[in-house]
From Swiss-Prot:
The keyword Nucleus applies. Residues 527-553 are annotated as: Disordered. This is Integrator complex subunit 9. It comes from Macaca fascicularis (Crab-eating macaque). Belongs to the metallo-beta-lactamase superfamily. RNA-metabolizing metallo-beta-lactamase-like family. INTS9 subfamily. It is found in: Nucleus; Cytoplasm. GO terms for biological process: RNA polymerase II transcription initiation surveillance; snRNA 3'-end processing. GO terms for cellular component: cytoplasm; INTAC complex; integrator complex; nucleus. There is a cross-link at K58 (Glycyl lysine isopeptide (Lys-Gly) (interchain with G-Cter in SUMO2)). Keywords: Cytoplasm, Isopeptide bond, Nucleus, Ubl conjugation.
Amino acid sequence: MKLYCLSGHPTLPCNVLKFKSTTIMLDCGLDMTSTLNFLPLPLVQSPRLSSLPGWSLKDGNAFLDKTELIDLSTVDVILISNYHCMMALPYITEHTGFTGTVYATEPTVQIGRLLMEELVNFIERVPKAQSASLWKNKDIQRLLPSPLKDAVEVSTWRRCYTMQEVNSALSKIQLVGFSQKIELFGAVQVTPLSSGYALGSSNWIIQSHYEKVSYVSGSSLLTTHPQPMDQASLKNSDVLVLTGLTQIPTANPDGMVGEFCSNLALTVRNGGNVLVPCYPSGVIYDLLECLYQYIDSAGLSSVPLYFISPVANSSLEFSQIFAEWLCHNKQSKVYLPEPPFPHAELIQTNKLKHYPSIHGDFSNDFRQPCVVFTGHPSLRFGDVVHFMELWGKSSLNTVIFTEPDFSYLEALAPYQPLAMKCIYCPIDTRLNFIQVSKLLKEVQPLHVVCPEQYTQPPPAQSHRMDLMIDCQPPAMSYRRAEVLALPFKRRYEKIEIMPELADSLVPMEIKPGISLATVSAVLHTKDNKHLLQPPPRPAQPTSGKKRKRVSDDVPDCKVLKPLLSGSIPVEQFVQTLEKHGFSDIKVEDTAKGHIVLLQEAETLIQIEEDSTHIICDNDEMLRVRLRDLVLKFLQKF
């Protein structure tokens, strides 16, 4: 069993597991932090951005050639754990020869579609007059400043996919539900479990009859809107692969939400606007719910909330119809009937308005001060670029970062000098290291496998030994482009036996309570299922010269020698030898058993726990005679 690590980002994993002749890809996250190396894409040509200085020559490291770790066309199945971990799916399904099946829950697919659609829309609606590609040249790249000169396999970086590729990729997905058992080629069974992180987010159990691998990715124990995490099903795992922990282990999500609300209120009271760069699904639901409870008490009920995204309407509607994927409290509201999320009431009362873009209706309804939720969190494309240009010159305005995926200082770099206030309130509800340690003690896997980053403290806080995984035995770590041999071997395989063959078996008791029977059978294997069938009967001799068909050529079953069991008591064996005329017998003890020496016959008998050897000098009659005496002490079956 081997694990191939294709991603260096622990929160956006892409691993391939080879298990029982089945090749399974675990997630296909898209690391978009590379976008921070590029200038923002404004909706309108920006003289300020256009006049930013270009790069200057630096001495760099030599370019490393691309190395193929695995042929992705050999992948049989892709398991998706949440919608953030499927953003690279079109690159794999459309450009690698992949012909397998993708499994994911319905909310994961629908919200993943929205994220991809928003990404494609943001990129395609800002066509560039010219496209730069010279920087991918090996000789040029090593002269670029860091981090571009240190980036891995820059020549393989691709343009954003199209909606046609997105639709084609999503058509290969088969929808599954929590605890649904899916059989893969008769070899292994995979089961999605609720991970508690996002709508439809899953952990996966991959098991055969005698082995069990758990894949934990992007899980949460906090009580937010998704179904709670299923921990019980993770018990008794041989291997637990752990990815997708919180990116900000020192930040408390509840404290960050409180800070978000207080900074938002302070800015609006002073006449400023608040910009919240965000994804169109996920944390935004929780932020809107907190604001629903907060704005009236803070006297902000007249301040408009704007949600701007090409998929804003779809996102808000989807969150209300996936009732069975929500936590119990929100599920119960559906039967009252009430909308599960309070943002429905915010929309009805016109406190929250959503728009596909800043054109059209938004331009007519726009009034300040206000709060704007829009993308993209990298500040490199999307409507957020326009608002950064619009509001960045005033110290009354504030940008609040809630998504932890991007460094806010790097995101702000192209907009400097910046007068507006910047608040960093990253909200990441995924498991922290304390919760992981408690979880591992409860489920007790035999082995834990995780990214290298989780086995050592963060570089900026090297003294914080509590910010790493602590388990026994110590976790096995991996890094990008590594192949890990998982530390357990398959020992058993399940085989069914046909009733007529079972009826023919004659068990013999070799020890009290233990019986054995020999089986002569034909092993039939199909779709990784094994069946023992009765051996074919010997073919009857046929007269004439009729030619046999190939199908009639059934191999004859040889008559097998009986198997032996039992042990030889040395004292009784010596007495038996003496009764049969052997004299001058000596017995010597060895590390493995005994040696019986027949000095007169110049013969040696080695008696060990699992074998007996008779060594004599070319006297076959003597050997056979001694063999028969040995067999008297053993059982045949």
